From Swiss-Prot:
Changing T286A: Same transcriptional activity as for isoforms with beta domain. It comes from Homo sapiens (Human). GO terms for biological process: adult heart development; apoptotic process; cell differentiation; muscle organ development; nervous system development; positive regulation of transcription by RNA polymerase II; positive regulation of vascular associated smooth muscle cell proliferation. The modification N6-acetyllysine is found at K245, K439. Phosphorylated on Ser-444 by CDK5 is required for Lys-439 sumoylation and inhibits transcriptional activity. In neurons, enhanced CDK5 activity induced by neurotoxins promotes caspase 3-mediated cleavage leading to neuron apoptosis. Phosphorylation on Ser-180 can be enhanced by EGF. Phosphorylated and activated by CaMK4. The gene is MEF2D. Changing S180A: Abolishes MAPK7- and EGF-mediated transcriptional activation. Changing H289A: Same transcriptional activity as for isoforms with beta domain. Changing D291N: Abolishes transcriptional activity. It is found in: Nucleus. Changing S444A: Abolishes K-439 sumoylation. Reduced neurotoxin-induced apoptosis of neuronal cells. More resistant to degradation. Transcriptional activator which binds specifically to the MEF2 element, 5'-YTA[AT](4)TAR-3', found in numerous muscle-specific, growth factor- and stress-induced genes. Mediates cellular functions not only in skeletal and cardiac muscle development, but also in neuronal differentiation and survival. Plays diverse roles in the control of cell growth, survival and apoptosis via p38 MAPK signaling in muscle-specific and/or growth factor-related transcription. Plays a critical role in the regulation of neuronal apoptosis. Its main location: nucleus. This is Myocyte-specific enhancer factor 2D. PANTHER family: MADS BOX PROTEIN, MYOCYTE-SPECIFIC ENHANCER FACTOR 2D.
């Protein structure tokens, strides 16, 4: 918006004339200063106002300029008002209005203004160099570290040793649709946007910290939800000898050896269930030991849980008395995908030295190396008595020579759903050597009614005698672990351990006598 043009004529109003004189006098002196600096010349201004008051301006010294003026005798340019008006008329101005300044003159600035603008420009350049590189483009790609369970089973926060082997794969999400900050609301299921979205709840967290199944883990992106849970589209499972078998979410579920829970609707969420009982078996383990009072919750009906978020349960019956500080969620959800004991037999987590090999307990498919499983002493249990290796009975000629087996105590009350002995700390001994059957011995009824459970009878497992009826033929031996269970009460994930008919007349003395007679070669 330019200045208001006024007519160039004498101002009649005294006040306006004084104001105009003051402003334009300073403007004239400013132009003289700029001209003297830019063009390296000497300028002298002598002004007398209407009241004959003198105002002068000199670029250097007025006397020196006036001396030069008086002594100068060469032809020179001399202009008056008439000359200026004539020049303006030639340029197109009528001489009545105040002409617009020339283009070059309008762009000229004083040295002070030039310095100020130069400093401002330098400051802006510094700001752009400092902060300009961090401004993201509209479509940018930001690498995000997402835990992906790709090589082994899932990762759990375990203060005293993890049951499963953690394996994280760093993936880079470069889709601008997922990480673009221009979108105010990101998808909560951004890792698998093609699947239906469901809100995450606390049921999806196993033990409060399921890092690889939930996107609630810390993410480098500060713009909201990156992944509410891991993509249920792909989940690596171990099936037989294949460690990297990937099952798509839309494929049929792998066959299981036990009765599966009825699923009313198919959902694309995967669940890794290693402890499966037809009657809704739940295993509750504390941080340091097995809480026997929690055994009352074994018969909780699965219909009482209505959570729809994916759950991963890794509670195995062979590790109940180990005192491992992990907790398991009740397997009360849709059983679209369940891992059988044969599929879990080759997982590296179940064959680690810190835990009992599930493949040796359930399927007995592959010979395992002799392991040294930890045998902590849970409450109300005694360590197994040392065994004396003796020659094996000749009824089993097809069995190869056995190496030294290592015994792992297993709580009987947690292995039997619906068992009338939830509080009895009787322990079975499970060998981790292949081709060895398990001989289970339930406790006598007198121990159930005792206020304080006595020390349980722990005996080494060996091949039962032909005449002994303590091993159930319906359960099958461990050499045929792939065979379906004849009874619906127990699944093969329980290690095919089942109680035999309770002997009424046998006491602890008879059991301890068998400790010396039952031998293992």
């Amino acid at each position: 918006m330019g200045r208001k043009k006024i007519q160039i004529q004498r101002i009649t109003d005294e006040r306006n004339r004084q104001v105009t004189f003051t402003k334009r006098k300073f403007g004239l002196m400013k132009k003289a200063y700029e001209l003297s600096v830019l063009c390296d010349c000497e300028i002298a201004l002598i002004i007398f106002n209407h009241s004959n008051k003198l105002f002068q301006y000199a670029s250097t010294d007025m006397d020196k300029v006036l001396l030069k003026y008086t002594e100068y005798n060469e032809p020179h340019e001399s202009r008056t008002n008439a000359d200026i008006i004539e020049t303006l008329r030639k340029k197109g101005f009528n001489g009545c209005d105040s002409p617009e300044p020339d283009g070059e003159d309008s762009l000229e600035q004083s040295p002070l203004l030039e310095d100020k603008y130069r400093r401002a420009s330098e400051e802006l350049d510094g700001l752009f160099r400092r902060y300009g590189s961090t401004v993201p483009a509209p479509n940018f790609a930001m690498p995000v570290t997402v835990p992906v369970s790709n090589q082994s089973s899932l990762q759990f926060s375990n203060p005293s040793g993890s049951l499963v082997t953690p394996s994280l794969v760093t993936s880079s999400l470069t889709d601008p649709r997922l990480l673009s900050p221009q979108q105010p609301a990101l998808q909560r299921n951004s890792v698998s946007p093609g699947l239906p979205q469901r809100p995450a709840s606390a049921g999806a967290m196993l033990g409060g910290d399921l890092n690889s199944a939930n996107g609630a883990c810390p993410s480098p992106v500060g713009n909201g939800y990156v992944s509410a849970r891991a993509s249920p589209g792909l989940l690596p499972v171990a099936n037989g000898n294949s460690l990297n078998k990937v099952i798509p979410a839309k494929s049929p579920p792998p066959p299981t050896h036990s009765t599966q829970l009825g699923a009313p609707s198919r959902k694309p969420d995967l669940r890794v269930i290693t402890s499966q009982a037809g009657k809704g078996l739940m295993h509750h383990l504390t941080e340091d030991h097995l809480d026997l009072n929690n055994a009352q919750r074994l018969g909780v009906s699965q219909s009482t849980h209505s959570l729809t978020t994916p759950v991963v349960s890794v509670a195995t019956p062979s590790l109940l008395s180990q005192g491992l500080p992990f907790s398991s969620m009740p397997t009360a959800y849709n059983t679209d995908y369940q891992l059988t004991s044969a599929e879990l037999s080759s997982l590296p987590a179940f064959s680690s030295p810190g835990g009992l090999s599930l493949g040796n307990v359930t399927a007995w498919q592959q010979p395992q190396q002799p392991q040294q499983p930890q045998q902590p002493q849970p409450p109300q249990q005694q360590p197994p008595q040392p065994q004396q290796p003796q020659p094996q009975q000749p009824q089993q000629p097809q069995q190869p020579p056995q190496q030294q087996s290592h015994l792992v105590p297993v709580s009987l009350s947690n292995l039997i759903p619906g068992s009338p002995l939830p509080h009895v700390g009787a322990a079975l001994t499970v060998t981790t050597h292949p081709h060895i059957s398990i001989k289970s011995e339930p406790v006598s009824p007198s121990r159930e009614r005792s206020p304080a459970p006595p020390p349980p009878a722990v005996f080494p497992a060996a091949r039962p005698e032909p005449g002994d009826g303590l091993s159930s033929p319906a359960g099958g031996s461990y050499e045929t672990g792939d065979r379906d269970d004849g009874r619906g009460d127990f699944g093969p994930t329980l290690g095919l351990l089942r109680p035999a008919p309770e002997p009424e007349a046998e006491g602890s003395a008879v059991k301890r006598m068998r400790l010396d007679t039952w031998t293992l070669k």
